[in-house]
């Protein structure tokens, strides 16, 4: 007899019980645990819903990974499994063989079914399988701890599909007996009120990643604060609020909202990304004030910064330890940049990426920034592309990078002297100017990757990712 023969005999025994409809809860209590996965797969493929219900009641493993078996949601299958759970949670005394603690509806554990189907029977014994069946995603449970149902929730429509609707309705009427655990929740389309109702049915400690895209005014973002305050294990948060989906907040650690603030008060944020918010001048100061711990990255794009906004950037502790600062497509040609220089001084010891791109910074403003920029010794990337500066101002800028030995990528605009009256580059003029700029730079340090002028180069299509000391098209 081959080594796979016992597996085949178990499969045949299970098929016989199912096809002859001899299966009862008493029969299942007497069967070896190795039979269950094979029988469950058979009942699943044959749509034997009563058998599925009974097998859930007698399931001899800690976890039932239904999601990896049911690739496409099937309402009747889900109903049968949940009816089996109903019988379990309603019993005051648990059945003798009851071990089931988690129904997992995520597609995360195909190995369980392939092992027991015989595809990998030679490499995994029942004892080893028993060790694999742990409940890693939830706390250790005592005798009367709630059952847990795991699912990843991605809402791309305004309403739930029939399976999710049934599941959430089932959960609603079994509070305290069953916890719905969602480690990852994404909402792209569901209305705010409906989504908040769903959050009330999810076990809050289970949420580790939350992503919300909503069109609403910024002063309504605080409606999510009461829910976030309960998510003690939240590791990643991505929020996009506003009429153009422009305010992004990314967190890597727990966040504790200040319920008195219209903004979400994030205690351990990593990144704040603000884009195209027309009324940000009414909110930026408020937002920065309520960020309690230092940000790792601040990205501000396609908006207008007033002088007061600039002052805010230099005043609040939340921006005092930035590793990444990106100001992109922000018209600064009339803005006082002295506060930005103060901010650069504060973050000089931590800043690694500085992007001041397409901001129309002119010579007088650039010179205000140079002393602070020269102290940013950790800088590895500097993008100053898309600004309006002369050759002499760029030379001055390059000289001030003498101490920035870690710079690996630099992007600079074509000097004003090389542009025609339409703002287009005259390559015959730019070529010798760039050579002179490179001589100026090499007098103070040796560059690694550097670009002057349009990116990508309109002549050869080169990008600054190429490892060239100096890009020059003829």
From Swiss-Prot:
The lineage of its organism: Eukaryota, Metazoa, Chordata, Craniata, Vertebrata. Keywords: Leucine-rich repeat, Repeat. It comes from the Eukaryota. InterPro entries: LRR_dom_sf, PRAME, PRAME_domain. Belongs to the PRAME family. This is PRAME family member 10. The keyword Transport does not apply. Coiled coil: none annotated. LRR repeats lie at residues 97-124, 179-203, 204-230, 231-265, 266-291, 292-323, 324-342, 348-375, 376-400. GO terms for molecular function: ubiquitin-like ligase-substrate adaptor activity. One of its GO terms (biological process) is negative regulation of DNA-templated transcription. One of its GO terms (cellular component) is cytoplasm.
């Amino acid at each position: 007899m081959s080594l796979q023969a016992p597996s085949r005999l178990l499969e045949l025994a299970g098929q016989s019980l199912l096809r002859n409809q001899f299966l009862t809860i008493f029969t299942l209590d007497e069967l070896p645990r190795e039979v269950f996965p094979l029988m469950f797969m058979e009942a699943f493929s044959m749509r034997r819903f009563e058998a599925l219900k009974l097998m859930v009641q007698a399931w001899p493993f800690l976890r039932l990974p239904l999601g990896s078996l049911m690739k496409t949601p099937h309402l009747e299958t889900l109903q049968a499994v949940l009816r089996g759970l109903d019988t379990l949670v309603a019993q005051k005394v648990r059945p003798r063989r009851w071990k089931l603690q988690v129904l997992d509806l995520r597609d995360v554990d195909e190995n369980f079914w392939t092992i027991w189907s015989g595809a990998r029977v030679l490499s995994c014994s029942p004892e080893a399988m028993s060790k694999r069946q742990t409940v890693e995603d939830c706390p250790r449970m005592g005798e009367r701890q709630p059952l847990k149902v795991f699912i990843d929730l991605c809402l791309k429509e305004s309403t739930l599909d029939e399976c999710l609707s049934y599941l959430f309705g089932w959960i609603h009427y079994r509070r305290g007996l069953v916890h719905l655990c969602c480690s990852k929740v994404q909402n792209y389309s569901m209305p705010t009120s409906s989504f908040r109702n769903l959050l009330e049915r999810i076990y809050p400690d289970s949420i580790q990643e939350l992503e919300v895209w909503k069109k609403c005014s910024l002063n309504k973002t605080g409606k999510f604060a009461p829910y976030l305050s309960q998510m003690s294990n939240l590791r990643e948060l991505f929020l996009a609020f506003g009429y153009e989906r422009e305010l992004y907040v990314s967190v890597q650690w727990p966040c504790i909202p200040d319920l008195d603030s219209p903004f979400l008060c994030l205690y351990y944020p990593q990144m704040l990304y603000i884009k195209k918010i027309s009324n940000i001048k009414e909110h930026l100061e408020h937002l920065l004030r309520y960020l309690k711990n230092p940000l790792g990255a601040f990205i501000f794009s396609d908006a207008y910064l007033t002088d007061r906004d600039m002052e805010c950037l230099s005043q609040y502790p939340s921006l005092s330890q930035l590793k990444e600062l990106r100001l992109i497509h922000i018209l600064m040609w009339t803005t006082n940049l002295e506060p930005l220089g103060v901010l650069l001084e504060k973050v000089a010891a931590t800043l690694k990426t500085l992007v001041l791109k397409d901001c129309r910074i002119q010579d007088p403003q650039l010179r205000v920034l140079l002393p602070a920029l020269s102290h940013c010794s950790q800088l590895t990337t500097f993008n100053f592309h898309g600004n309006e500066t002369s050759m002499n101002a760029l030379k001055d800028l390059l000289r001030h990078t003498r101490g920035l030995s870690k710079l690996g990528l630099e992007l600079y605009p074509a000097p004003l002297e090389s542009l025609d009256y339409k703002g287009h580059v005259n390559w015959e003029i730019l070529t010798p100017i760039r050579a002179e700029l490179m001589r100026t730079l090499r007098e103070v340090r040796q560059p690694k990757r550097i670009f002057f002028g349009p990116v990508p180069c309109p002549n050869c299509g080169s990008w600054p990712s190429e490892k060239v000391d100096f890009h020059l098209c003829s």
